[in-house]
């Protein structure tokens, strides 16, 4: 005991070096490389689950103990020491650590993020790149554990880390629409077919002598769907939507078939005439007759029924034709006369009221 007290360095010069460990007592060679000693102790401190544990012997190095100062100023750290077999094995184990162990927890410590050491101890991995075990302090970031703090993770890893709602779902819209389109191709006509049918329908309708309003009324009589003259006009002009054109095409096609099949027999013609109002023949008035009517209009813009009858007999025209001509002439005069000016029919005072039906023509 006295000898040990008188020679405090006898422990360092002994043939064996003994230090405390969590698993028990381990002996080390006095000529063992301090770098290898630190790496072997670190490897023993890593359990099977991949979580490195803080070794109390390594922690004591950062407390400024005698071993810390001795190793920091040792000439072995200043000279170039080639890595041994244990160094290569340690680097290979750290480099080939499985990704699921590294991503096990966001608080898992990376070998590059261990506590600082006073000496720059480093090892070389299997790829030949230096791997600092103790000299890079810091904390790990989730998703960047295997790639350091500056290099982003691969694209596959970033995709897996996204929330399921944020991930792009597989595009099934095109497949669904393509399936529906293939299913409806047999029933839905193309735009070229609709254009060709509209052209043929207009030609056949004019040849048969029916107006667009007649067709709309006929569809209501045949199928219960009354269409206006505007709808038939927009169909012929291809101004309806594609969906409405497809709905109206079979109805008009049936009407054409019915009209073509009933052209020869009088009974069928009467049936079609009853379905819709047949177009009346346009009346053409000669220039001489029109001059007589103009002269009479300047004298009396609103003739009575007896005057219309006598005028129709003298001109050999129908009474309805004369009445409609006067009605249309008054409307024309009203359009041509600026507002506020006195119109010709206001000069003459007549007690006969104009028939309201003349304005419909």
From Swiss-Prot:
The entry's DNA-binding region: 278-337
Keywords carried by this UniProt record: DNA-binding, Homeobox, Nucleus, Phosphoprotein, Transcription, Transcription regulation
Region (Disordered): 99-131, 144-192, 334-361
SMART domains tied to this protein: HOX (SM00389), POU (SM00352)
Major subcellular location class: nucleus
Biased composition annotated in UniProt, kind: Basic and acidic residues: 165-183, 343-361
Tissue distribution of the protein: Brain specific.
Positions carrying Phosphoserine: 265
Compositional bias ranges of the Polar residues kind: 119-131
One Pfam match: Homeodomain
Protein localization: Nucleus
Family annotation (CDD domains): homeodomain (cd00086)
Residue ranges occupied by any POU-specific domain in the UniProt entry: 186-260
Assembly with partners or alone: Interacts with HNRNPU.
Family: Belongs to the POU transcription factor family. Class-3 subfamily.
Function (record text): Probable transcription factor which exert its primary action widely during early neural development and in a very limited set of neurons in the mature brain.
Name assigned to this protein: POU domain, class 3, transcription factor 4
The species this protein was found in: Rattus norvegicus (Rat)
């Amino acid at each position: 005991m006295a000898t040990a007290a008188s020679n405090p360095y006898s422990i360092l010069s002994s043939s064996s070096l003994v230090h405390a460990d969590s698993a028990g007592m381990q002996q080390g060679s006095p000529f063992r490389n301090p770098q290898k000693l630190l790496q072997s102790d670190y490897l023993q401190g890593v359990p099977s689950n991949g979580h490195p544990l803080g070794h109390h012997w390594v922690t004591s190095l950062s407390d400024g103990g005698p071993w810390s100062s001795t190793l920091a100023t040792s000439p072995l750290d200043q000279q170039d020491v080639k890595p041994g077999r244990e160094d290569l094995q340690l680097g290979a184990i750290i480099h080939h650590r499985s990704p699921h162990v590294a991503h096990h927890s966001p608080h898992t410590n990376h070998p590059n993020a261990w506590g600082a050491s006073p000496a720059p101890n480093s090892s070389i991995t299997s790829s030949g790149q230096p791997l600092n075990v103790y000299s890079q302090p810091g904390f790990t970031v989730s998703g960047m554990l295997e790639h350091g703090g500056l290099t982003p993770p691969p694209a596959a890893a970033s995709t897996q880390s996204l929330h399921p709602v944020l991930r792009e779902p597989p595009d099934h819209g095109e497949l669904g629409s393509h399936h529906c389109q293939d299913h409806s191709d047999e029933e839905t006509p193309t735009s070229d077919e609709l254009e060709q049918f509209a052209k043929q329908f207009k030609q056949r309708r004019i040849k048969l002598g029916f107006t667009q309003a007649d067709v709309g009324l006929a569809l209501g009589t045949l199928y219960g769907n009354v269409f206006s003259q505007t709808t038939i006009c927009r169909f012929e002009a291809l101004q309806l939507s594609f969906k409405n054109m497809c709905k109206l095409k079979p109805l008009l096609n049936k009407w054409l078939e019915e009209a073509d099949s009933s052209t020869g027999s009088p009974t069928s013609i009467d049936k079609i005439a009853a379905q819709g109002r047949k177009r009346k023949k346009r009346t053409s008035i000669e220039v001489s007759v029109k001059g007589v009517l103009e002269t009479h209009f300047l004298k009396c813009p609103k003739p009575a029924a007896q005057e219309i009858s006598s005028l129709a007999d003298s001109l050999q025209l129908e009474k309805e034709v004369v009445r409609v001509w006067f009605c249309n002439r008054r409307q024309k005069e009203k359009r041509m006369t600026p507002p506020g000016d006195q119109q010709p029919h206001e000069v003459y005072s007549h007690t006969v009221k104009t028939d309201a039906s003349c304005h419909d023509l």
